[in-house]
Regions:
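Gly/Gly-Pro-rich "capping" loops immediately C-terminal to redox-active cysteine motifs
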Residues: 66-102, 117-134
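N-terminal type II signal-anchor transmembrane helix
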Residues: 2-34
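The canonical Cys-X-X-Cys-His
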Residues: 50, 56-66, 105, 140
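C-terminal capping alpha-helices of c-type cytochrome domains
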Residues: 21-24, 101-115, 128-142
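Electrostatic cytochrome c docking/interface patches
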Residues: 31-55, 99
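N-terminal/domain-start segments enriched in small and hydrophobic, helix-friendly residues
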Residues: 22-40, 94, 110, 121, ...
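Aromatic/His-enriched, Gly/Pro-containing loop or helix-boundary segments
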Residues: 39-42, 91-97, 101-111
Length: 142
C-alpha cells in the first residue's frame, strides 16, 4: 500500500473514531426521566424561594431580551459557536415551559439535556448550575 493511501486510511479511521467518541459522549448521563406528574399546586414559599433563586442566578440576563417581557427569551447571545437564543421560561404552555415537568426542567438545568434528550450545549449545562439541588430546581420551576 502506498504512503498516501496509508495516510488516507489513517485519516479516515481517525475521523471515524472522533465521530464515534462524540456520539458516545452525547449519550452519557442520558438516564430516562422519572414518570412524575406535574405539580399543579405549589406552596407560596416555594414560589417565593424560586423567585429569589432566579434573581440570584440572574436568569433575566439571558432569558429576557432588551425591552422584552421578563423570562420570555429571545435574547441573542454571541458565542464563539455563533449566536445562541435563550428560550422562553414563562409558564406559557405553548411558547414557554408551562407544558414541561419539573423533571424535564431539572434535566435541562442540571444535565444540559432537552426534553427529547439532545444536548443543550454549548450553553448548558452551565458549570455552576450543575450544583443546584433538585429542591432548588423545583422551586425555580414553580
Amino acid at each position: 500500500m502506498s504512503t498516501w493511501r496509508k495516510r488516507l486510511a489513517t485519516a479516515g479511521l481517525s475521523v471515524a473514531l472522533v465521530a464515534g467518541g462524540i456520539w458516545v459522549l452525547n449519550r452519557l448521563d442520558e438516564a430516562p426521566l422519572p414518570h412524575a406528574e406535574r405539580v399543579t399546586t405549589t406552596a407560596s414559599l416555594d414560589i417565593a424561594r424560586g423567585r429569589y433563586l432566579a434573581r440570584a442566578g440572574n436568569c433575566l440576563a439571558c432569558h429576557t431580551r432588551q425591552g422584552g417581557v421578563a423570562f420570555a427569551g429571545g435574547r441573542g447571545i454571541e458565542t464563539p459557536f455563533g449566536v445562541i437564543y435563550a428560550p422562553n421560561l414563562t409558564p406559557d404552555r405553548e411558547t414557554g415551559i408551562g407544558a414541561r415537568s419539573a423533571s424535564e426542567f431539572w434535566r435541562a438545568l442540571h444535565n444540559g439535556r432537552s426534553r427529547d434528550g439532545r444536548l443543550l450545549s454549548p450553553a448548558f449545562p452551565y458549570p455552576s448550575y450543575t450544583r443546584i439541588t433538585r429542591e432548588d430546581s423545583d422551586a425555580i420551576f414553580a
